[in-house]
UniProtKB/Swiss-Prot annotation:
Extra information: In the RecBCD complex, RecB has a slow 3'-5' helicase, an exonuclease activity and loads RecA onto ssDNA, RecD has a fast 5'-3' helicase activity, while RecC stimulates the ATPase and processivity of the RecB helicase and contributes to recognition of the Chi site.
GO cellular component, as recorded: exodeoxyribonuclease V complex
Self-association state and partner proteins as the record states: Heterotrimer of RecB, RecC and RecD. All subunits contribute to DNA-binding.
Job of this protein: A helicase/nuclease that prepares dsDNA breaks (DSB) for recombinational DNA repair. Binds to DSBs and unwinds DNA via a highly rapid and processive ATP-dependent bidirectional helicase activity. Unwinds dsDNA until it encounters a Chi (crossover hotspot instigator) sequence from the 3' direction. Cuts ssDNA a few nucleotides 3' to the Chi site. The properties and activities of the enzyme are changed at Chi. The Chi-altered holoenzyme produces a long 3'-ssDNA overhang and facilitates RecA-binding to the ssDNA for homologous DNA recombination and repair.
GO biological process: DNA recombination; double-strand break repair via homologous recombination
Coiled-coil residue windows: none
Record-linked InterPro entries: DExx_box_DNA_helicase_dom_sf, P-loop_NTPase, RecC, RecC_C, Restrct_endonuc-II-like
Protein name: RecBCD enzyme subunit RecC
NCBIfam families from the UniProt entry: recC (TIGR01450)
Species this chain originates from: Haemophilus influenzae (strain ATCC 51907 / DSM 11121 / KW20 / Rd)
Keywords: ATP-binding, DNA damage, DNA repair, DNA-binding, Exonuclease, Helicase, Hydrolase, Nuclease, Nucleotide-binding
Similarity remark: Belongs to the RecC family.
Stored Pfam families: Exonuc_V_gamma, RecC_C
Molecular function GO terms recorded: ATP binding; DNA binding; DNA helicase activity; exodeoxyribonuclease V activity
Length: 1121
């Protein structure tokens, strides 16, 4: 008997299954009951629930339909192999061998053109093509077995006739393409069958076995090996071929199919079935055996008889009924149609076990209307939160908002636990880092929510697997410095080469200093001094020779690796040697036996085997051996290129099951998969974006099924719509849906998934007052709006962001200029260099010394491209080094710069060297007569009025750049003039004025100017120094807003109107000109003090007090050409 149980709730179906086990125990207590399921997750849930119901769940087997049916073939048909010779993987490898043989034939011109025009290697493209064709053949075997038989008979025109009959209006060009695709696919299939027969005596595929097994079942006298009964649970749809097999078996044993039907009314296709037949169908009521229920309600029947009601696939909607069910339910509707259609010729016992939805909440009303095939306005309560839609600015914000939502739910409902929550996304790998970042850390006093991740790829979740696959894909790598250093972040790899975590900062410093940028070999495309080989030669040479000892065999010792650091340099060299050998190996194609050796050696060469890694290394080794054995079985002897083997191993390793984490007593994060939507109190859907869901799958142009539709065909977007419907119906108390609704860059609105839009339109139809609106969340976690109690349930629990949220940039409390009187230390002495640094940039000094905040405006990453131009820092370094060299040593210096990888390669380097040489020689003329510089110590006391008392401050340190008998301060900068260059010589000169007689005014020399600083009297100099020291002391408690980073003289003015504009310029970058100052940018972004004229006046007054004397007497400036 074929028994179909129709219910809208899995809990009820589970209850029926449990009662069957109790009332009808198996005759043999040792025989396993067979329960077909769609996924291991459904089996896991069912086992747990049956154990709760009966106290135990044992001796149950949960195969997938395809594997179970193949097992039936193997047990009952003698010629059937235990392993399917026509599985997708085997067909792919065979096709890789066969396709090249046929490429010269006229029918195969589309394949020939595809392979020849590929930018990738032809073999890799052949591998991809073979995989696509194998997948297509596998689909034909299940959904179009009649085409397979037509090809085997050589009757290709049968297929094109079927397509033309269903689509008579196809244009001639497309139909010709379909005919061509049919011919080459038929020829390839016939060759595939012959190839399988050469290895296996009987090349029997699933379609042929299907017919043979049906014939066997039709023979009542023939012996058969069948289970005593079969249960089918939690499968939304079965391929027609599988259903036919199970229906045929039902003449021998009982088949119990549990169909999770979202609607208790008939909502399948009506036009293809006779109305009188449908009207006669009855349903038996579970627990009400004396009552039968007709297939149609009275309203439906009346409308049908009056021709008001038509449900067809072509229209994809119901003229009367529930629009959501019509739009999303195609997969279930087709299967329902097939089940009802087959009741006419298959003895079927249909049982209805629908559960009424008792809740009056928005979610309950929605589920109830779907159950009853209704379409009426919903009653939306003002504070109903059973179904909420959330718009965020990014995936990270989606997870943060979800975290707050769940914490709020747990607060409101103490009975709710983490295991009652499932969170499903279109692609769990995309969200994994955000989930781990938000749910994996503790936010102040807020407790962590336990969570588990299912379905993420092993390459995304295991660092050893990820790095192993990275190594396999190094064939086309340019070995950039950053890419290689990332490998050393992997503990198992780092330890294999005896490099510790503490060594990594030094390794990065060496890589930077040795000029490594990209490339493995030094002699790659000419001499590449930025390669790993060149850099490592410098490190190794540096162990014995310092840079000053000159070039040895086109290399230069690296000073920082000199002496005791030689062991680390040797370990790095060992790592490089292994990478270089691997790269060379990957350039060649190899047999599978050789690849087995290479892949195994890769594990031992690059990864340390210890307690943490041994299991995963063993697993990878197992997969390598399985692949090798499989290809040997198929007699695949072609040599494989590295990109193909990398792809194959990736697929092997990513198939690792981790779905057992699905029901682990925690919040379940997983991918939205068929029948993953088992009942949960809280169902959350993330990433419901327009571009991401329903997921798109571009059809192959040679897929013939797309031109010939049959009920039961699987279409990815239709499947996703049904998954969304299942998720909505699986929520028992709450359903939460979120998407990225605004751009994080410009805040422009972005559309949600069309399914979300349809849901919102359906809920709000006919609503006048209370409509369901999308809750829009702030872009940042620290927005003040997140911490306000409101009716939209958006309050944040992340207390770590509360201080920032409470920060008000418009209030006085936000000002950097507030005093910091806590833990004030008494200063009795000031070092000269510290005082100069303070005066040169008082804002930066405050951030770094008082707040401990350091802004870096340069990219810390190592460049990964050839340097056709010199960076500003390299240019400055070269110029200043050459200033101290004699002209006859310039050539050696430039040669060293080339070997160090500083100068651009080839002619570019020569041009740069010539330009630098000319500029340096010109500047050397300006400083040629200075003689040798001297330095002098400074140590004296200053009397400073500060904090309402007179304090004696010791000023001490050293002054350099003193020239001549009179120790004149002369500073030079090999750069264009900037006002701030005057500050150091100015302070030195002030000290000379205070501490010695007849101090000579200081001088500044730059590329474009030579200027003498203004002479001043001792008392004036003392007063000026007292201003600097007093403000230095004051900077302990208050930032000193004196702009020194651009033209200081712009702020020694009496006109206040242009000051705001000049301040704003400090925060702006100007092409190749000055860059924005990060410290001033931060100050001006977080203070409103300069909106008041009195504060601008204060800034001008202080700037004039600091530099009025220095920049007032412009007549002392001299310009030299």
């Amino acid at each position: 008997m074929f028994i179909v149980y129709y219910s809208n709730q899995l809990e009820k179906q589970k209850e029926i299954l449990s009662s069957l086990f109790k009332s009808l125990p198996p005759e043999d207590p040792f025989q396993q009951d067979i329960i077909l399921v769609q996924s291991p997750n459904m089996a896991q849930w069912l086992q747990i629930e049956l154990a709760k119901e009966t106290g135990i769940s044992a001796n149950l087997k949960f195969p997938m339909p395809a594997s179970f049916i193949w097992q039936l073939y193997a047990q009952n048909l003698p010629a059937t192999a235990l392993e399917n010779p026509f599985d997708k993987d085997s067909m792919m490898w065979r096709l890789m061998r066969l396709i090249p043989i046929f490429l010269e034939k006229e029918n195969f011109s589309p394949l020939r053109n595809y392979l020849s025009s590929s930018p990738h290697s032809e073999q890799y493209k052949l591998y991809q093509l073979s995989s696509k064709i194998a997948d297509l053949f596998d689909q034909y075997l299940v959904y179009r077995p009649e085409w397979i038989f037509a090809w085997e008979k050589g009757e290709d025109e049968q297929i094109t006739d079927q397509i033309q009959k269903q689509q008579p209006n196809l244009n001639a060009t497309l139909f010709a393409q379909i005919q061509g695709n049919t011919k080459w696919q038929g020829e390839l299939w016939r060759a595939l069958v012959v190839d399988v027969k050469s290895d296996v005596n009987e090349a029997t595929h699933r379609a042929a076995l299907h017919n043979q097994f049906l014939a066997l079942l039709a023979d009542k006298k023939a012996p058969k090996k069948l289970p005593s009964r079969i249960f089918i649970f939690g499968i939304p749809a079965l391929p027609t071929a599988y259903l036919n097999i199970l229906q045929a078996i039902s003449s021998e044993v009982d088949i119990h199919l549990f169909f999770n039907n979202p609607c208790q009314e008939y909502w399948g296709d009506i036009s293809d079935l006779r109305l009188d037949y449908l009207r006669s169908r009855q349903r038996y009521q579970f627990n009400k055996q004396d009552e039968n229920q007709p297939l149609f309600s009275e309203d439906q029947l009346s409308q049908l008889e009056n021709a008001q009601f038509d449900v067809t696939y072509q229209k994809e909607n119901l003229q009367l009924g529930n629009p959501l069910l019509a739009a999303w339910g195609k997969m279930g509707r087709d299967f329902l149609y097939i089940l009802v259609r087959d009741e006419e010729h298959i003895p079927t016992y249909p049982v209805n076990a629908y559960q009424e939805i008792e809740s009056n909440s928005l979610l309950g009303q929605l589920q109830s209307q779907i159950l009853h095939l209704e379409n009426k306005p919903l009653n939306i309560a003002k504070n109903d939160r059973t179904l909420t839609l959330h718009s965020c600015h990014s995936a990270m914000r989606e997870v943060e908002v979800l975290h707050d939502y769940l914490l709020d739910l747990f607060n409101q409902d103490p009975s709710l636990t983490p295991k009652d929550v499932v969170v499903m996304v279109a692609d769990i790998n995309q969200y994994t880092p955000y989930i781990q970042a938000v749910f994996g850390q503790k936010n102040g006093d807020v407790p962590q929510i336990p969570f588990s991740l299912s379905d993420n790829k092993l390459s995304e979740s295991d660092v050893l697997v990820s790095s192993y696959l990275t190594l396999l894909r190094l064939k086309e790598s340019n070995f950039s410095a950053e890419d290689v250093l990332v490998l050393l972040d992997i503990p198992a790899m780092r330890e294999r080469f005896n490099i510790s975590l503490a060594d990594l900062p030094l390794v990065r410093e060496w890589v930077t200093d040795s000029g490594i940028r990209f490339g493995l070999q030094k002699n790659q495309d000419g001499i590449n001094f930025n390669s790993w080989q060149a850099g490592l030669e410098r490190m190794i040479l540096g162990y014995a020779m310092r840079e000053e000892q000159g070039i040895w065999q086109d290399s230069l010792g690296l000073n920082s690796s000199y002496g005791l650091k030689g062991e680390l340099a040797g370990n790095l060299s060992h790592f490089f040697t292994a990478l270089s050998a691997l790269h060379e190996t990957l350039q060649q194609a190899h047999s599978i036996e050789k690849w087995q050796e290479i892949l195994t050696a890769l594990l031992s060469d690059f990864f340390v085997r210890n307690e943490d890694t041994s299991d995963m290394i063993f697993y990878i080794q197992e997969k390598i051996n399985e692949l090798a054995e499989h290809l040997k079985t198929l007699h695949f002897n072609e040599e494989l290129q590295a990109e193909v083997i990398a792809d194959v191993i990736t697929m092997q390793l990513e198939d690792a099951p981790n779905s057992l984490k699905f029901l682990a007593g925690k919040v379940n994060f997983c991918t939205l998969l068929p029948m993953r939507s088992v009942p949960f109190k809280v169902v959350c859907l993330l990433g419901m974006n327009d571009a991401d869901y329903p997921r798109t799958q571009t059809p192959n142009s040679f897929d013939l099924m797309q031109y010939h539709y049959q009920k039961g065909d699987r279409v990815r977007r239709d499947d996703d719509r049904y998954l969304f419907l299942e998720a909505l119906l699986a929520a028992r108390d709450y359903c939460y849906i979120s998407y990225v609704g605004r751009s994080i860059t410009d805040n422009q609105p972005k559309e949600p998934s069309v399914l979300v839009s349809q849901l919102l339109d359906y809920i709000n139809q006919g609503q006048k007052e209370n409509v369901l609106t999308v809750i829009e969340h702030p872009m940042t976690a620290f927005s003040p709006d997140n911490f306000k109690n409101n009716e939209k349930f958006t309050r944040s629990f992340a207390t770590k962001w509360l201080p920032i949220a409470q920060f008000d940039a418009s209030s006085n409390n936000s000002e950097f200029a507030v005093t910091m009187t806590e833990n004030l230390e008494k200063i009795e002495e000031v070092e000269l260099d510290a005082l100069v640094s303070f005066v040169e940039n008082p804002v930066k000094f405050f951030f770094e010394k008082q707040l401990g905040v350091y802004f870096r405006d340069k990219d810390e990453r190592i460049a990964d491209s050839e340097n056709f131009t010199l960076s500003g820092l390299d240019n400055y370094s070269l110029n200043n080094d050459l200033i101290y060299l004699d002209e006859q040593n310039f050539a050696d210096y430039f040669r060293q710069a080339e070997v160090k990888g500083v100068l651009p390669r080839a002619e570019f380097g020569k041009v740069y060297a010539e330009n630098i040489r000319d500029n340096v020689l010109e500047f050397k003329k300006k400083i040629a007569d200075l003689g040798e510089a001297k330095h002098a110590s400074v140590d004296f006391n200053l009397s400073v009025d500060w904090q309402n008392e007179n304090q004696k401050i010791r000023l001490f340190g050293y002054m350099d750049a003193l020239f001549g008998d009179d120790s004149q301060v002369i500073h030079w900068h090999f750069a264009k003039y900037k006002d701030r260059y005057c500050i150091r010589p100015w302070i030195y000169y002030l000290i000379q004025c205070v501490t010695q007689e007849n101090a000579v005014p200081a001088k500044l020399i730059t590329q474009d100017k030579v200027l003498e600083l203004p002479p001043i009297e001792r008392e004036v100099a003392l007063a000026q120094l007292q201003i600097y020291v007093k403000d230095y002391l004051q900077s302990q408690i208050e930032i000193q807003l004196v702009p020194t980073v651009r033209n200081i003289s712009d702020f020694i003015v009496s006109d206040e109107n242009s000051v705001s504009e000049k301040l704003q310029e400090l925060t702006e970058s100007n092409g190749f000109g000055p860059k924005a100052d990060p410290y001033w940018s931060r100050v001006l972004a977080q203070t409103s003090r300069f909106k008041q004229p009195e504060n601008i006046a204060k800034l001008l007054k202080q700037t004039k007090a600091w530099f009025g004397l220095l920049f007032a007497q412009k007549k002392t400036r001299k310009t030299q050409s």
